[in-house]
Amino acid sequence: MKWLRKGLLLFLTLGMFVGIVGCTTQNPQFPVPQTTAQEVTAPTKDPMKEAYKKDPAHFVEFTRSTQPRQHYVPFSELLEYETQYPDCNGTWFRDQLSGEDLIIYNSYLYALENRFIGFNLYVEDSDKDFSYIRELVSLDSPFLEQNYTHYEHIWKRPINYIGKQISVSMEQFTDSRWEMKMEALAKCKQIVQNIPAEYQTQQAKMEYLYDYVCDNVKYVTYESMADESYFYDAVCKGETLCDGYSNMLSLLFRMIGVECCEVMGKGEEGQDGHTWVVAKLGDVYYNFDPTFEDTSEIPSEQRKYFGFSDDLVSMQITDYEEMRPKCTDTSRDFSYADMTVTSLTTWEEVKRIVSISEERLAAGKETTLIGVKAPVDSAQYDVFFDRFSVYAKKSKKISLYTWTMRNTALIEVNLE
């Protein structure tokens, strides 16, 4: 019996072994899952990032606030970059740039339109003025706010110069701020679509849009220049400062096919600068300034700043004087004035001014506006006032107000 038990135990052991082996072999009737080593897939590499690592001097590294944080664009692609909003952005200043300047310009534009909050690049000229190029972008694009004297408050961190590697921070290029711009853009499209049918010519449409801006936007000052959206405020709130007026008007003009750009000027020391629009009326460039329609003290109900020459500009545009469009045609200047003269000091002109002023007074109009198409200094004003007083004997009271521009002047004569 002992040997029988051993044999039975051996038989059972062999049977279990055979069963186990059978279970591990492929059997079409009883398929068994195979246990293999887990395959490990290598993470996909970003080819642009790899190219950047090998040659960072020919790439721009853009940064966003969300993942993936880094985005790499080669110089060659940025040189050819075209705005995603060709009906909204102009190219007047961009078309005059090349090389590094154009790469920097397009880096700002690329970051703005794709909501990147910063970028890094290498430049050959570490002293290059990025702020100057950024201003050119703001003059071509209504989507980039700019204020001449308070610009640093808009940009949260100043531009850092690290050798030849430049780091630019733009914390205002966010999704929420871009949505505000798109809301304003949508409203501008509605304004253009609603131009009445009787405005057929391009000039008539320009006049309608200019009047719309003047009638629906008022000038306000801001307690802080930080984080403000002047374009959005102009279009959607109906209040802004000169930047917002110009952003809105330039965009509306482009939407009807008018070639235009914005222009910035410097005031006297201690005064703020100013922004307005230069646009083509027919084949000629003129200045357009809806801000001054609201803030001007000139007593005229007519539009005073729809199309005028550089002679009527009081601001200095020294930073890019050679780049901006020149407005040399003076035929539209002082279209709102009651008369124009070429001199204030000749007896003949003074007599004519007195005669017209007294005729207007007799008709119940106490104010006469005189456009002087020549430079006028303080000594000439004194001579004019003395001679005017000699001839204006019918008036009990005479008061004169003057506005001096670059090569012209305006005189307001009030008689009683």
Task: Locate each region found by the language model.
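Gram-positive cell-envelope targeting signals
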Residues: 1-50, 176, 209, 237-249, ...
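Solvent-exposed loop/turn segments at secondary-structure junctions
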Residues: 175, 215-220, 240-242, 267-271, ...
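Short clusters of hydrophobic/aromatic residues that line enzyme substrate/ligand-binding pockets
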Residues: 234-235, 306
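Acidic/polar residues at beta-strand termini and the immediately following turn/coil
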Residues: 219, 289, 403-407
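N-terminal accessory/pre-domain segments preceding catalytic cores
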Residues: 19-200, 314-416
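Hydrophobic/aromatic-rich core segments of domains that either
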Residues: 244-311
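Secondary-structure boundary elements
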Residues: 178-234
